[in-house]
Each structure stands twice: as C-alpha cells, then as structure tokens.
C-alpha cells in the first residue's frame, strides 16, 4: 500500500525485465532473482497472462500489496472467491496481506505494536528494515487515532 500510495501511483517497470536485469547485472541478487523470475513465470502461466505485461517496482514486486512473485504464489488468497488471486483487487490484496502477516507470526487479537513485538517482527519479514517496520507501525498508530476519533 505505502509503495503504491494505496493504488494511486501505478507501477513503472516490467516485473520480468526488473528481475531479469537483476539476474544478469547484480551478482549478489542473481540467485534470488532467478528464483523470483521462475515464480513469475509460474504465476503468469496459472493466471494465463503475458509475463512481459505485468508491471511493478524496480525490485520486481507487483500489485497493490507489492508482493514479490514467490510470496504472492505462496501466500495470496482469493478472498472474494471469484476464482482469481488478483493483486489489483482490494479484497484479495487485503486478505492476502492479512494471511501473509499471520503466516509470519502476527498474533490474533494483538494490541502490542512495540519494537520487536511479534506484530513488529511479522511486519519486518516483508522488508527486513527496522525503519520500515517502525514506519508501518507509526502509520498504523496515526490511522487508528483518526479512525477512532471519527466515531
């Protein structure tokens, strides 16, 4: 959501080209990008889409939730039960993000968002940066204030 400004900013890069560029140009990321490229091709085949047409980030993430292909294949869900796990359908995206977080340790009925809490750690699995996890938690806290003040 944050990376795409909640769907307002659209992807600028071919996911295939982004991953392939990493395979051939970035030795430290080559193995990872090769696996992600394979996962992209699996996703494209399953969804019957052209892998060259999927747009995403410079790093190869796509959709409103900015999933990398392996995470999308493993953890996306068809929340609205229309037969498609759609990275550009908010019902599927929010359901998939929730599933991703719970699969990565986000506890049920959680109210502890402190540094290094289980919720914080599950957010950090998405982007292995303390600053990123802190920013998401801060955003959550500000959003909660606005939501609860409106009632």
Name each region found by the language model.
Residues 1-151:
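Catalytic glycan-binding domains that act on GlcNAc-containing polysaccharides
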